[in-house]
């Protein structure tokens, strides 16, 4: 589906990935999904590596601790090369998602309080990657927030969110 979307969009697909949480007891456990964070992290890392292999358009044989693929070829190949960008989401200030994101193309830190925290994110990722060139930092704020401080802190993408008050 990712390669199809990349082709149909003319190369504008971005894959977002994160561990997820079972806060309400309905997001993971209701479907029998793994609940241990470390195991889910290992599964995510393996899955992203496998997806990257599959995007190559070459024949893939993979036998990992969590996933198997035997003689699989994905076509069409993505328009974007060397691959579709991958953005990693994670709760600030947890370090594991930052380390994971530094290996990919972007980071969407959840629960940032202010631009200074985004600046801290940027510094950590720069220290891991050596540069922020070609790397996206995504922020989510209220629609009436001023983007200038976030841009100065390193934001490359801006998402506006609306809170729906269901009590009224």
Segments the model singles out, each with a brief description of its role:
Residues 1-168:
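Active-site-adjacent structural elements that line small-molecule/cofactor binding pockets in enzymes
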């Amino acid at each position: 589906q990712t390669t199809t979307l990349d082709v149909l969009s003319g190369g504008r697909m971005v894959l977002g990935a994160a561990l997820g949480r079972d806060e309400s007891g309905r997001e993971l456990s209701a479907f029998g999904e793994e609940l241990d964070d470390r195991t889910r992290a290992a599964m995510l890392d393996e899955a992203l590596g496998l997806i990257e292999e599959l995007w190559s358009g070459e024949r893939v044989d993979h036998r990992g601790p969590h996933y198997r693929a035997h003689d699989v070829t994905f076509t069409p190949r993505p328009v974007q090369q060397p691959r579709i960008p991958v953005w990693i989401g994670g709760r600030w200030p947890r370090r594991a998602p930052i380390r994971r994101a530094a290996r990919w193309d972007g980071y969407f830190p959840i629960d940032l309080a202010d631009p200074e925290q985004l600046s801290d994110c940027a510094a950590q990722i720069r220290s891991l990657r050596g540069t922020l060139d070609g790397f996206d930092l995504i922020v989510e704020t209220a629609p009436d927030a001023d983007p200038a401080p976030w841009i100065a802190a390193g934001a490359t993408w801006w998402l506006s969110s609306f809170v729906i008050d269901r009590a009224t």
